[in-house]
Structure formats: C-alpha cells, structure tokens
C-alpha cells in the first residue's frame, strides 16, 4: 500500500496564507520545495498541483483553491481522474486536539468538526478511510472561539513549533514512501518540537 495523492488543506488567498487553518498547505508547499516540483494552478482539479517521485513512488500533490468547506471537490476530481483509491490518499490538516509542535498520522475516523475533512468524506462517497496527517495547532480552550482561532495567525513562538512539526512530518512522509508506514509512524509519533 502506498500513497499516490497528498493533499494540503487550506483557504485560498493571501489573507489566509499564514492562518492556522492553512497548516496542511504549509506541509505540501514544503514537500514541493524539497523535491523541486513547484505547484501550478490546474483548473480541472480546483487547486494547485504538482508531481513528485519518492523512491520510485509517483505521488501527486494538491492544495485546493476552493474554500476549506469545499475541499472534497478538488480531492474527488483528482482521485477520480487518476483512479486513486481513498486509502492511497493522505490529507494534511490543522488539528485542534494536538498541541503546536506535534503531528500524527491516522487512517480513517470521523471529521472532528473539521469542515475540510467533512467535505472530503462526503465527496469520496461517504468514505472516511483515507490517511490523515494531523498537524497540531492547539485549542483556544473555548469551543465558541474556535473559528476565530483557526482563522488567526499563531504567535511567533507557536509558529516555530508548527514549522518544526511540518518539517518532521515531511521527513516522515519520505520514510513512509521508502520504508513503510510503521517506521514513519513510530518516528513521527515520538517527535515533539521544543
């Protein structure tokens, strides 16, 4: 089992680029940079796309240009076109239930109130069985403050922790594609940025 599509969830536009909700896109941007495979807008996939080769694995990258709650439109378009199954997809997203500096891989599960995940599950025919990369952003402590929190920019100290976790997640994604998910998971899940 390998990954054929890696998606970084985000809201489009400069005003959202540095917000916590765009952490998934930061990770895909880093992978694209690392493999010198610049993302280019592709209208038929409703997003920015690229293609990388990791140890012989052909992997597509996608950052949807839809708003977050319509992310599934882009993911389903690309998965259908390239005949990519849900369990061959890795979706990177911001995670309120993990602190900044922590990232975890996960297969399947619910959407935890995340509108991007909710739409992807729906557009994949109510199939939640895709891989996720949960990038910790922390929680504001009050559920009524969540919207403002995810659409806000983290302070410099938190941004540094998130960036380090994104960097480690990118390394662990390469390990996954070379040596398998177990090895990658063991490494990523023992990481915590200081």
From Swiss-Prot:
TRNA binds at residues 16, 67, 69, 115. GO terms for cellular component: cytoplasm. Keywords: Cytoplasm, Hydrolase, RNA-binding, tRNA-binding. This is Peptidyl-tRNA hydrolase. Monomer. GO terms for biological process: protein quality control for misfolded or incompletely synthesized proteins; rescue of stalled ribosome. The gene is pth. GO terms for molecular function: peptidyl-tRNA hydrolase activity; tRNA binding.
């Amino acid at each position: 089992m390998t990954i054929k599509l890696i998606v970084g969830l985000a809201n489009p536009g400069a005003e959202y680029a540095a917000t916590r909700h765009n952490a998934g896109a930061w990770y895909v941007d880093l992978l694209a940079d690392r493999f010198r495979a610049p993302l280019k807008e592709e209208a038929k996939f409703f997003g920015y796309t690229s293609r990388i080769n990791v140890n012989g694995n052909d992997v597509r990258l996608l950052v949807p240009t839809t708003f977050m709650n319509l992310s599934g439109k882009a993911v389903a378009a690309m998965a259908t076109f390239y005949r990519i199954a849900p369990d061959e997809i890795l979706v990177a997203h911001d995670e309120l239930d993990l602190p900044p500096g922590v990232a975890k891989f996960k297969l399947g599960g619910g959407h935890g109130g995340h509108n991007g995940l909710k739409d992807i599950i729906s557009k994949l025919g109510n199939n939640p069985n895709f891989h996720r990369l949960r990038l910790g952003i922390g929680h504001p402590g009050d559920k009524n403050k969540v919207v403002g929190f995810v659409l806000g920019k983290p302070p410099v100290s938190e941004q540094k922790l998130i960036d380090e976790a994104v960097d480690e997640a990118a390394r662990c994604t390469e390990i996954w594609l070379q040596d398998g998910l177990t090895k990658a998971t063991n490494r990523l899940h023992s990481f915590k940025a200081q």
